[in-house]
A protein has these predicted regions:
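A mature extracytoplasmic/lumenal domain signature
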Residues: 43, 51, 61-63, 76, ...
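Positively charged n-region of N-terminal signal peptides that target proteins for export
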Residues: 1-4
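Conserved catalytic-core segment of clan PA serine endopeptidases
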Residues: 22-31, 65, 70-120, 126-131, ...
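Sec/Tat signal peptide C-region and signal peptidase I cleavage site
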Residues: 16-20
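C-terminal subregion of chymotrypsin/trypsin-like serine protease catalytic domains
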Residues: 21, 28-37, 45-46, 50-65, ...
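Short alpha-helix capping/helix-loop boundary micro-motifs
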Residues: 44, 57, 123-127
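Bacterial N-terminal signal peptides
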Residues: 7-15
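Chymotrypsin/trypsin-fold serine protease catalytic domain
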Residues: 106-187, 227-228, 234-241
Length: 252
């Protein structure tokens, strides 16, 4: 009962439409945003996920660790939040929490199986980034996280932002920055609650989900948000995602 009360409190915190992604991400309810969902945990955390099948949500492993209960928050046509039960959580077997916390590459990928289909949403097509990934390649991130670090009430509605690859992007990890600020001063980027959010790349047939948001920093690598956005690309994990989802009966 106590865990359920915590989940309800977290859902109500996110019930009022606000913003997500620091630095001015664009509010969006259509397009890629229609696949975005909110994940709440009984320990009070909240993260972002993507619907990839009517009963399957893709997110990051560090958001859905064992020892807690998780639910999906969905808003009806009148905006009232509802909690949907999660039947099963599958975490990639190669995920390493210490590596993620140190911003090193790891299999930060997980799937949630819902008890019932989530209606009124779109599903995202799962793919992989175009290889080789070039510095300056453009990606679109989406999330329900906070716009003000440390202020949970500033999160809750889906926002999207266009970022570009920096550093040495590859199949293990992609680091994204605001193309205007280049990570050296406050800019657009992921923040608390955006973890697990989808990273899209435009393909000939439309946007494809090619990665998930794992971590963020402030400018110049400082603690915070608005600097780097760390992404786990799905290149090495797409097969595991498809196999796991199909073992649950999902058609991908």
């Amino acid at each position: 009962m106590k865990k359920l009360a915590t989940l309800i409190a977290a859902a109500l915190l996110l019930a009022t439409p606000a913003h997500a992604i620091v630095g001015g991400g664009t509010p969006q309810a259509d397009g890629v945003a229609r696949a975005v969902v909110t994940i709440v945990g009984s320990r009070g955390n909240f993260c972002t996920g993507s619907l990839i099948a009517p009963k399957v949500v893709l997110t990051v492993a560090h958001c859905v660790q064992p020892g807690a209960d998780y639910k999906i928050v969905d808003r009806g046509a009148d905006g009232t939040p509802q909690l949907l039960n999660v039947r099963t959580v599958a975490i990639h077997p190669n995920f390493n929490m210490q590596a993620m916390q140190a911003h090193r590459a790891t299999a930060d990928v997980a799937l949630l199986q819902l008890e019932i289909p989530l209606k009124g949403k779109s599903t995202a097509l799962v793919g992989a980034p175009t290889i080789p990934i070039q510095v300056g390649s453009r990606f679109v991130i989406a999330g329900i996280g906070v716009t003000v670090r440390g202020n949970g009430k500033s999160g809750g509605a889906t926002r999207v932002a266009g970022l570009v690859a920096t550093g040495q992007p590859g199949t293990f990890q992609i680091r994204l920055v605001d193309p205007v600020t280049n990570g050296v001063r406050d800019g657009i980027g992921a923040c608390t609650g955006d973890s697990g959010g989808p990273v899209f790349e435009d393909k000939p047939n439309g946007p494809v989900l090619v990665g998930v948001i794992s971590w963020s920093t402030g400018p110049n690598g400082a603690a915070g948000c608005g600097g780097l956005t760390g992404v786990t690309p799905l290149t090495l994990y797409r097969d595991w995602i498809l196999q796991t989802a199909r073992s649950w009966g999902a058609a991908l």
